[in-house]
Each structure stands twice: as structure tokens, then as C-alpha cells.
């Protein structure tokens, strides 16, 4: 039982790692599009963010998994489930991260940009050395909340047949007629979440050199 749950946890861990690797950088251009003065770009970003945040992640997984077959007639392969799952998680979380970035960037007073210009800073230097340190500190709690939510959201992958830890525990409960696999899975999720919270707390302390 523990071996099977361990294998399921590794799948959940892979999804947990791959999602931020894709969604954190993807959220950056979406955030800048959202703040763009070019109306079409701004509206594309607004619609994207609205769809990602306004529809269930599970529904997005189903759409990405089945769309190639029903729309283009592309045959589904054993790898299709995993690919659809990762893509759905990345584009979903990118929508949330984009809004977090936007709120962080727009929270910086305009006067700081003007002061940097007077001091001879270029736009890039202003962004890297003045704006980014403040934005990073301000958005970290919100980013942390999304990362913690992601730990639990990995269990949604079972909906399209990805063998992560929850689906493994569910199969074990059915075969063994026992709730023990669920209890062990819950404990693993809790420990994993606790470790993530500790790491995020350490990161917040690391950025505590700047005080509003």
C-alpha cells in the first residue's frame, strides 16, 4: 500500500513542480498585456484571466484533454492525460498569477518611478532595482496562498485518469474496503503542505529587509 501511495505522491509532486515552472513565467506577459495601453492586448488578457478564474479547473482539464479528438480528430494516447493535466494546470494558474503581478506592480507609487528618473536610472534599472524588490515582497503572500492551494488541487488530476496520490488512495480503499489509505493520503498532503508553508515563511522573512 505504501509503495503505491508513494508512486502516486511522486506523480502529484511532479505536477506540483511543473505547474509553477510554467505558470509563473507565463503570468508575466499576461500581466503586462492586462496593463497595456493597447486595447486589443488588454482585452485579450482580461478575457483569458476571466475564463481561467471563472471556470472550474476540472472543466478546463476535460476541455484540453478531449478537444484534440472532438475538434481535430486527433487520437488520444496514454500520454494525453498527463499532457492535458499539466497544460490545464499551467494556463489556469497563470491567470491567477497574472492578476497578482498586476496588483503588485500597480501598488508601486508613481512618484518612485519619477524619483528614479531624476536620479538617472534607466527604465530597466528602475524596474530591477527599485520596483521588483518591493513587488516581490508585496505579492509573496498571495503567491504563497496559490502555491498552497496547488498542493490540494493536484488531486483534481484524478478526473481525467491521471494516477496521482488521491486516485491511488481511492483505488486502494475500494480494493481493501478500508479507509486507511485515505487517512494516510490525508497525512501526506498535510505534511507536504506544512513543508511548503515553512519554505514560504522563510522566503517572506528573507524579503523582510524592506518595510513599507
Predicted features, each with a name:
Residues 1-212:
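Transmembrane alpha-helices and adjacent helix-loop boundaries
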Amino acid at each position: 500500500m505504501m509503495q503505491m501511495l508513494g508512486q502516486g505522491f511522486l506523480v502529484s509532486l511532479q505536477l506540483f513542480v511543473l505547474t509553477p515552472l510554467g505558470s509563473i513565467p507565463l503570468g508575466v506577459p499576461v500581466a503586462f498585456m492586462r496593463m497595456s495601453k493597447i486595447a486589443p492586448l488588454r482585452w485579450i488578457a482580461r478575457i483569458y484571466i476571466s475564463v481561467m478564474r471563472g471556470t472550474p479547473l476540472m472543466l478546463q482539464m476535460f476541455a484540453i484533454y478531449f478537444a484534440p479528438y472532438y475538434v481535430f480528430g486527433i487520437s488520444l494516447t496514454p500520454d494525453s492525460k498527463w499532457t492535458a493535466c499539466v497544460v490545464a494546470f499551467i494556463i489556469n494558474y497563470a491567470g491567477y498569477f497574472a492578476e497578482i503581478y498586476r496588483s503588485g506592480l500597480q501598488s508601486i507609487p508613481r512618484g518612485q518611478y519619477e524619483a528614479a528618473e531624476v536620479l538617472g536610472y534607466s527604465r530597466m534599472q528602475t524596474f530591477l532595482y527599485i520596483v521588483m524588490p518591493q513587488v516581490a515582497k508585496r505579492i509573496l503572500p498571495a503567491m504563497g496562498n496559490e502555491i498552497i492551494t496547488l498542493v490540494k488541487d493536484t488531486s483534481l488530476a484524478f478526473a481525467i485518469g491521471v494516477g496521482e496520490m488521491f486516485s491511488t488512495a481511492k483505488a486502494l480503499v475500494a480494493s481493501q474496503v478500508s479507509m486507511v489509505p485515505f487517512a494516510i493520503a490525508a497525512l501526506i498532503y498535510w505534511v507536504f503542505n506544512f513543508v511548503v508553508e515553512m519554505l514560504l515563511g522563510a522566503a517572506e522573512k528573507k524579503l523582510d529587509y524592506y518595510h513599507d
